[in-house]
UniProtKB/Swiss-Prot annotation:
<feature type="transmembrane region" description="Helical">
    <location>
        <begin position="57"/>
        <end position="77"/>
    </location>
</feature>
<keyword id="KW-0812">Transmembrane</keyword>
<keyword id="KW-0472">Membrane</keyword>
<dbReference type="InterPro" id="IPR010065">
    <property type="entry name" value="AA_ABC_transptr_permease_3TM"/>
</dbReference>
<dbReference type="InterPro" id="IPR035906">
    <property type="entry name" value="MetI-like_sf"/>
</dbReference>
<feature type="domain" description="ABC transmembrane type-1">
    <location>
        <begin position="19"/>
        <end position="216"/>
    </location>
</feature>
<keyword id="KW-0997">Cell inner membrane</keyword>
<dbReference type="GO" id="GO:0022857">
    <property type="term" value="F:transmembrane transporter activity"/>
</dbReference>
<protein>
    <recommendedName>
        <fullName>Octopine transport system permease protein OccM</fullName>
    </recommendedName>
</protein>
<keyword id="KW-0813">Transport</keyword>
<dbReference type="GO" id="GO:0006865">
    <property type="term" value="P:amino acid transport"/>
</dbReference>
<dbReference type="InterPro" id="IPR043429">
    <property type="entry name" value="ArtM/GltK/GlnP/TcyL/YhdX-like"/>
</dbReference>
<feature type="transmembrane region" description="Helical">
    <location>
        <begin position="12"/>
        <end position="32"/>
    </location>
</feature>
<keyword id="KW-1003">Cell membrane</keyword>
<feature type="transmembrane region" description="Helical">
    <location>
        <begin position="96"/>
        <end position="116"/>
    </location>
</feature>
<comment type="similarity">
    <text>Belongs to the binding-protein-dependent transport system permease family. HisMQ subfamily.</text>
</comment>
<dbReference type="Pfam" id="PF00528">
    <property type="entry name" value="BPD_transp_1"/>
</dbReference>
């Protein structure tokens, strides 16, 4: 098939229409999932089994099953229960957008909870004990000691989860949502040129994730002053402790 720059350009422009929906799914699912994940992480680090066990089971279930299966269960499966069809949740569960958003949020919460749990457990126990010895209240302890250090530790892993969620929005096309991949599938059925269409779609996802990765890199740079590269080369005198003005 001959190379057609005009077709690529027209395809690229057509796929841009799916970016707003993809971003809405990614941003809102990450926001909801983060709130749920923080609650799950606190339950996981709790010493009470009746808090730890439900969180552990939730994380196991959603990490151990494919996201596509979860989307299908929520969109196609829940509608077979008469109680749900007559409940206040039905106006949301009958809409593909809310089903996709819910599945994405529940899925990312399971992964993010483990990332947050690792960040919380990475805080040195000595600092926590010292803060308690100084009479620091639990809320203040979390706000000034635990949370700032936990955020720094979990940020690299959390940035990877955000990138994965941006790509996972493509699965929303399986339940009729016309985001980037949904529009791409429609164009392929009309043009029978899957290579060019999916190449354009992949370029859009790559650009979106590049921007997201750069934003997280900027946040990491601002949170780790000691990791910033100095503009002036460090010479031998500096290493010996001499100060140059």
């Amino acid at each position: 098939m001959p190379f057609d720059p005009l077709f690529l350009w027209e395809t690229f422009i057509a796929l841009l229409a799916g970016i707003p929906l993809a971003l809405k799914l990614a941003v809102f699912s990450i926001a909801v999932g983060t709130v749920l994940a923080f609650s799950l992480a606190l339950m996981r680090v709790s010493r009470r089994w009746w808090l730890d066990f439900p969180a552990r089971f939730y994380i196991f279930a959603f990490r151990g099953t494919p996201l596509l299966v979860q989307i299908y269960i929520i969109y196609y499966g829940l509608s077979q229960f008469p109680g749900l069809r007559h409940s206040l949740l039905w106006p949301f569960l009958r809409e593909a957008y809310w089903c996709a958003l819910g599945a994405l949020a529940l899925n990312t919460a399971a992964y993010s909870a483990e990332i947050m749990r690792g960040g919380l457990l990475s805080v040195p126990a000595g600092q926590i004990e010292a803060a308690r010895a100084c009479g620091m209240a639990r809320v203040l302890l979390f706000r000034r000691i635990i949370i700032p250090q936990a955020i720094r530790q979990m940020l690299p892993g959390y940035s990877n989860e955000v990138v994965l969620m941006v790509k996972s929005t493509s699965l929303a096309s399986t339940i009729t949502l016309m985001e980037i991949t949904g529009i791409a599938a429609k164009l392929i059925s009309e043009t029978y040129r899957p290579v060019e269409v999916f190449a354009c779609a992949g370029a859009i996802y790559l650009t979106m994730n590049f921007i997201a990765a750069r934003l997280f890199a900027l946040i990491e740079w601002s949170l780790w002053p000691e990791r910033r590269k100095t503009r002036r080369p460090v010479d031998l005198a500096d290493q010996k402790g001499e100060l140059h003005v």
